[in-house]
Amino acid sequence: MKLLPWIFSVLFALPLYSQAAGGNSVVSVDLPIPAPEWTLPAIENAEGDLSLSDFRGKITYVDFWASWCGPCRLSLPALNALNSQFADDPVQFLAISIDVVEEDAWDFLKRYAVDYPVVIDTEGDIARTFAVDGMPSGYLLDGQGRVREIHIGFKRGDELKLAESIKRLLSDMATSEVDET
């Protein structure tokens, strides 16, 4: 099974999260892990189905959230601000609702608008594949679709850490493009 090594890698990284100094909610992945492919129906800011492969070539932040998640009320507006900050860069934000009832996700989005694509995983299959363990959970992917960081939970200031990580990946991307020429 192709996903088995990926799942074991993520499970290996999660204990590092609990050991992070000062309650830091970010786990850096030293050896980038290819993210599993998925396809889910869009419910906001996109039409039809979206797949991870739609975002290849862009740094992508995949954010798992739910309507019952308290910290998601802070994280989604913060991610909107980052989406605006990086609008001119090859950066994409994507929200994946894990609500079982689609109407719950819609009600939440009416109160906490999101400016980037939102898809829904009512069966929880993709969340299980990513080994999501806590809400919200975010996965920062490089342009090749590899997981570079795992973010678990959200508190004020986490968006600043995420912005720095995105800038670092943008710099790496620019450097690799120069090296290829």
Located regions from the model:
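Thiol-based oxidoreductase modules, predominantly thioredoxin-like and allied folds used
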Residues: 90-103, 114-123
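Conserved redox-active cysteine motifs that mediate thiol-disulfide chemistry
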Residues: 64-81
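Short pre-active-site segment immediately N-terminal to redox-active cysteine/selenocysteine motifs
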Residues: 58-60, 64-68, 134
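Bacterial N-terminal signal peptides
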Residues: 6-15
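Positively charged n-region of N-terminal signal peptides that target proteins for export
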Residues: 1-5
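Non-globular targeting/processing and membrane-anchoring segments
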Residues: 172-181
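N-terminal "domain-start" segment that seeds a small globular fold
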Residues: 21-52
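Thiol/disulfide oxidoreductase modules built on the thioredoxin-like
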Residues: 107-115, 122-167
